[in-house]
Amino acid sequence: MEKMMDEFKRKMIHDGKSDRTVEVYVNSVKEFFRWFYDSYGNVEYKKLYRENILEYKSYLKNIKKSSHSGNNLCPKSINSKLSALICFNELVEPDNIVVSKKDLIKIQAEIVSPTSITKREIEEFRQIVLQAEGCAARRNFAIVTILAYAGLRISECLNLRKSDICLESNQLRVTNGKGEKARIVIVNSKIVSAVREYQKTDRVESEWLFHNSRGERLNQTTINRVFKLCCPKGYEITPHTLRHFYAINAVSSGIFTIPEIANQMGHSSIKTTMRYMNPNLEEIRQKVEML
């Protein structure tokens, strides 16, 4: 099985999948094989069978428990595991396709609750990051600014290469987006200024825009630590909070069309973007008083 997993990993890397995707998919497929041998004993694995896929899907839906909550897996988690098997099937057993996207569970889109973080609080957080001690302050400030005002996923931000950003044209190129989709994101002057000032102090040779002192791509653990240290008391700000903030504010501004926001955020469907079109309760309250 090790040889097969090495082949799977190698082919994913060759296809340009991100390190995170490779890690998650490898772990998910290994989990399938653990279930396979637990279920069928010492029977030698030959190939994927449709019957096994359906039984595994039933196991995920009805028996498998979340390691975090102890409850049944949510549809999103099940789909993540099935997506790994779809990829494995396509890359390792391309002549034996027995699982596809049709097997994914349809998820009812939920309205995203309004963010409780205001722009003032985001700006306070950004300033704390900028004023933090250490040579990495400007780097971290640039990262936080991109997350808040371009809406990138943290993985997309940390995967940016220096060649991916063009300050003169106010745009950056995301090449390792979710689903491995590439896109161009237009950025504002806050981001241009933050990145430009960071680059003035960056003396390390590296292909990565955001890197450590050895020139290696920055990892998410480091950024999570920055958020924890700099987040004002009483606030709960994470990288995803900033992406959420961007989406809510882009939608509520009325300046952008939904397809424009979907492109900026890398949503494959505008239905995902429309989840952020929830009503502003304060505005409704004011309108009700006018009746």
Where is each model-derived feature located?
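N-terminal core-binding DNA-recognition domain of tyrosine recombinases/integrases
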Residues: M5-S113, Q131-A132
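Alpha-helix N-cap/helix-start motif at helix boundaries, enriched for small hydrophobics
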Residues: L85, I143-V144, G151, S155-L160, ...
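DNA breakage-rejoining catalytic core of tyrosine-based enzymes
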Residues: A109-F125, G179-S189, R203-S206, Q220
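Catalytic-site neighborhood detector that most strongly recognizes the C-terminal catalytic loop/helix
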Residues: S116, N176, M265-M290
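Basic, Lys/Arg- and aromatic-enriched nucleic-acid-binding interface segment
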Residues: E124-I154
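Short, basic (Lys/Arg/His-rich) helix/loop patches that form interaction surfaces
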Residues: Q131-G134, V185, V204, N224-N263
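Conserved tyrosine-mediated DNA breakage-rejoining catalytic core shared by Y-recombinases
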Residues: A150, N159-A194
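Active-site/catalytic core of tyrosine-dependent DNA strand-transfer enzymes
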Residues: N188-Y235
